Design a protein with these regions (language model features):
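Primarily NTPase-proximal linker/entry elements flanking Walker-type ATP/GTP-binding cores
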Residues: 13, 17-143, 149-171, 175-195
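Short, glycine/acidic-enriched loop or turn micro-motifs at the edges of active sites
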Residues: 147, 199-200, 237
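Conserved small/polar residues in nucleotide/adenosyl-binding loops
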Residues: 250-251
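Phosphate-binding/switch loop-helix module in NTP-utilizing enzymes
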Residues: 173-223
Length: 251
């Protein structure tokens, strides 16, 4: 099976999993009301979607505490679910903050990590666009030296956002590329360096060691860097996201 067919099959599996669970919730809308039984069904559907028992239970409790009046439409229930999820996530939200420029070591390094296909390169481009709009001088580094067209994809985002992209040859040393990127970003007097890394599974020891090497090289030049390590997750992976975060947080 080609990589494209494997990717398509994987995306369809994730989509079907979520759609199947949400369709169970959608069927409740025909009742036009929310009662104890329907909330239990919603909780079960969320658990089947691999949201996690504790989170599903917390959402269900929030729904029970609401004062439901009149007909409950699909949009009303979706909005209520979104509000419950927001309430859970807000306490752990961490905004990106930047120090005031005081010297060359104030280059803010952001390292993007995650499994294949999670959207790291696209996230790099979106972050660059956001920071550029804030008036910051941004440089991106294509440290994904393995994936076909990874450099071209990031270069495309660089062209769209008018951001310099530092790259090397495919199959090259990602840590060496990160080292050179810091040198060039400093020479350009950049405020932010976004390093896009190759996708890697958390259970592959050799790939995690390579990521650790990149971090060691970065710290040799800027001890406090990377100031932010962002893991990019597919929203449909469920509880596997926790395993990804746990393993990468110890690197």
């Amino acid at each position: 099976m080609s990589w494209l067919k494997k990717l398509t099959a994987g995306l369809k599996k994730s989509s079907d999993k979520v759609s199947s669970s949400l369709s169970g919730i959608s069927r409740l809308f025909g009742k036009g009301r929310i009662d104890a039984a329907s909330i239990e069904e919603i909780e079960e559907a969320l658990i089947l979607a691999d949201l996690g028992v504790s989170v599903a239970s917390e959402i269900a409790e929030g729904l029970r505490a609401r004062n439901w009046q009149g007909e409950v439409t699909p949009d009303v229930l979706r909005e209520a679910l979104a509000e419950q999820l927001t309430d859970i996530l807000l306490p752990v939200e961490k905004p990106l903050t930047f120090k005031q420029a005081e010297g060359e070591n104030d280059l803010h390094v952001i390292l993007l990590v995650g499994v294949n296909g999670s959207g790291k390169t696209t996230t790099a481009g979106k972050l660059a666009a956001r920071f550029q709009a804030q008036g910051r001088h941004v440089v991106m580094a294509a440290a994904d030296t393995f994936r076909a067209a990874a450099i071209e994809q990031l270069s495309g985002w660089g062209a769209r956002t008018e951001t310099k992209v530092i790259s090397g040859e495919r199959g090259g040393d990602a840590a060496a590329l990160a080292f050179r990127a810091i040198d060039e970003a400093r020479a350009d007097k950049a405020d932010v360096l976004i390093i896009d890394t190759a996708g890697r599974l958390q259970n592959r020891a050799e790939l995690m060691e390579e990521l650790a090497k990149i971090i060691r090289v970065i710290k040799k030049q800027i001890p406090e860097a990377p100031q932010d390590s962002l893991i990019v997750l597919d929203g449909t992976v469920g509880q596997n996201a926790i395993a990804q975060i746990d393993r990468k947080s110890v690197v």
